[in-house]
Structures are given as C-alpha cells and as structure tokens.
Amino acid sequence: DCASGPCCRDCKFLKEGTICKRARGDNMDDYCNGKTCDCPRNPHKGEHDP
C-alpha cells in the first residue's frame, strides 16, 4: 500500500483514527485516515492553527 510516511508501517496504511501528530498547546491531534501515508490535517482545527 505505501513505502513510508507517518501513516505507513510495514508497507501498510495505519488504521483510520491512529494519531499521527500529537496536539501541542491548544491545537488538536491529527489522525491517519487509513487511505494515505501522509498525516492529514485535522479538519476541526482552526484556520490559523499550524
């Protein structure tokens, strides 16, 4: 499925809902979606959150 990335392990996508980037400050966690090796941005984050 994948070669590398925060949502890839052993050439497989990590399960949807797996945290791939922990929240910092008042930010929110980012989660794998089970379909990509990248760590998608949490859609519930504010517009100006990093």
Swiss-Prot record:
Keywords: Cell adhesion impairing toxin, Disulfide bond, Hemostasis impairing toxin, Platelet aggregation inhibiting toxin, Secreted, Toxin
GO cellular component: extracellular region
Motif (Cell attachment site) on chain: 24-26
Disulphides: C2-C11, C7-C32, C8-C37, C20-C39
Location in or out of the cell: Secreted
Principal subcellular localisation of the protein: secreted
SUPFAM superfamilies: Blood coagulation inhibitor (disintegrin) (SSF57552)
Tissue: Expressed by the venom gland.
Domain (Disintegrin): residue spans on this chain: 1-47
Lineage: superkingdom: Eukaryota
GO terms, molecular function: toxin activity
Subunit annotation: Monomer (disintegrin).
Chain's role: Inhibits ADP-induced human platelet aggregation.
Other information: The disintegrin belongs to the short disintegrin subfamily.
Membership in a protein family: Belongs to the venom metalloproteinase (M12B) family. P-II subfamily. P-IIa sub-subfamily.
Protein name, entry field: Disintegrin pyramidin-A
